[in-house]
A protein has these predicted regions:
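Walker A/P-loop NTP-binding motif
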Residues: 13-19, 36-55
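Walker A/P-loop
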Residues: 23-45, 255-257
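Conserved Walker A/P-loop ATP-binding site and its immediately adjacent core
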Residues: 39-41, 56-79, 260-262
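Inter-Walker segment of RecA-like/P-loop motor cores
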Residues: 78-116
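Conserved RecA-like ASCE ATPase "motif II neighborhood" in helicase/translocase motors
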Residues: 103-128, 132-145
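Post-DEXD/H (motif II) to motif III coupling segment of the RecA-like Helicase ATP-binding lobe
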Residues: 131-203
Length: 276
């Protein structure tokens, strides 16, 4: 697999960061827009470690929030790594607990209490790093896992995200005892658009009439509470689908952002019933 220039640069930037910052508590971010191929970059990080330092057996844990991302990351890892490097899962949703694999792709909900079963780990890669609690005093799943693993082995950590700041505009590297201490590499949306790796969004010419009232939705850690927001959005989806069909029926491809998977599936179903 031939990497794009920015993908190779991101990997090189990470290794340069780790070389400069020797303390395991120095944890960088790779800022990578949606569509940049985070799973490819993740796989290349692991591939280079096994190629350069096989004598250290650089076993790696890739933390993801969902089984879908677990399967996506594992697929890229299996495509890039030699057959003798075993890629396994720890995911209740997939029915697999392969704690002794060379590279473990794990859903955080399934592994956060299982650090003691992993043995010697050299690297932890956190996908969707903005999901990590912003408070050092908060014993969330990610911090619990890292703390427990740190009691049995020494390892380096990196986070990957498309959004290096939270809904309250506070950067992931700022605030009360942030987990992440700096940005090792930053790929911009403009760079991907200019190189035509991403297509620009085309907004509708017609006025959008639907306005979702989220004034009663609660706020947590500077962002909307997803469950409450999803419930509110659900009541608007039929109206949204009808309006979208009216103003964008001539477009070949659409993209819709919803607060939850349930919202997305419901909207897709409504669009299908409208002939989209």
């Amino acid at each position: 697999m031939i990497l794009r220039d920015y993908q190779s640069r991101s990997v090189a930037d990470l290794f340069a960061w780790w070389t400069k910052h020797q303390d395991n508590a120095d944890i960088p971010l790779l800022v990578l827009p949606t569509g940049s191929g985070k799973s490819v970059i993740c796989a290349e990080i692991v591939r280079q470690m096994w190629e350069q330092w096989p004598e250290y057996r650089p076993r790696t844990v890739v933390l993801v929030p969902s089984k879908e991302l677990a399967e996506q990351n594992a697929g890229k890892l299996q495509a890039l790594l030699p057959d003798n490097i075993h890629v396994g899962y720890v995911s209740a949703s997939l029915g697999k607990k392969q704690h002794h694999a060379d590279v473990i792709v794990a859903t955080i909900g399934s592994i956060h209490k299982s650090a003691h079963l992993l043995g010697d780990i050299k690297v932890v890669i956190i996908d969707e790093a903005h999901l990590v609690s912003p408070k050092g005093s908060d014993s969330g799943m990610y911090r619990t896992f890292l703390d427990k693993l740190g009691q049995i082995c020494q390892f380096r950590t990196v986070g990957m995200t498309a959004t290096p700041f939270r809904g309250n505009q506070v950067w992931l590297t700022d605030g009360d005892e942030p987990l992440f201490t700096g940005i090792a590499s930053n790929v911009t949306m403009r760079e991907l658009l200019d190189q035509k790796f991403l297509a620009p969004l085309v907004p509708p010419n017609a006025r959008i009439e639907t306005r979702i009232d989220a004034s009663q939705v609660g706020i947590s850690n500077g962002d909307y509470k997803v469950g409450e927001l999803s419930a509110v959005v659900d009541s608007y989806l039929q109206q949204v689908a009808i309006e979208a069909t009216r103003i964008a029926s001539e477009r070949m491809k659409w993209i819709a952002f919803t607060p939850s998977v349930d919202n997305a599936e419901s909207l897709a179903d409504k669009l299908c019933k409208l002939g989209i």
